[in-house]
Amino acid sequence: MEKPKPVTQAGKAIALAAVVLLVCVPFLVIVSTSLASTDEVVAGGGWVLWPTEPTLKAYRDILDGGIVTHALGVSAGVTVVGTLLSLACTVTLAYALSRPGVLGGRPVLLLVLFTFLFPPGMIPSFLLVKELGLLDSYASLVLPVLVNVFNLVVLRGFFQGIPDELYEAARLDGAGDWRVLVSIVLPLSKAALAVVGLFYAVAYWNSWFYASLYLESDHWPLQQVLRTYVVAGSGLTDATTGEGTITAPQTVQMAVLVIATVPILLVYPFLQRYFTKGVLTGAVKS
């Protein structure tokens, strides 16, 4: 294999450094602005690259029992409960559709794929949620999107890749479908489950559209509150007292951005080893 030329390596390094700066500098500006004083941000034209006197005042203001604290709890609860329920439903349905000879398996698969190709519109979805009595309830953020077809197809394909000999050996030992799923399929699918679980968690955490449709403002999750702070900052309820309206300073807006971004970023390091294992498993053939 020919060794890359120094010029080529230098070009790749410069391009990679440019991409890193393009990604990291905006986030650094957001964090720095959230830690700066209001006067320093105003003097800097609305943003600060590095605060001279860092302060946590913006974080104290929005986390002192106000709407952001409540919204953070809502988002965390919806993300945890929604991810667990979605994984449970997706795993069971994917396992059933991955096994040959399941009664009605192909029609169900075609029906699921049909919903992927032709998703329901906003008005039919709203009317369905209304008829089910789910308006202004947290269930409206989970039940309408409980199973994602893409994640279902990913898990189904992974389950189909498990050698049939393992299924046959379990059957000979007298294991039923649930025992096979719990004792054989799930332990072998940790990498796929981690990826799909992360997809679900990110989707639930970042969801704001359904909240704007189905929930009143006192039940909003964090992303909807974030949108209100950043896009319509002049019409906010006071984050500390819960009364009146204020114009959110730039420091408060950036602090809300950090609070909305950091929790989901912290999940990646814990799942990194499963991603690596999944890549190696797909690259090595027995």
Predicted regions and their residues:
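A hydrophobic, multi-pass inner-membrane permease signature
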Residues: M1-S286
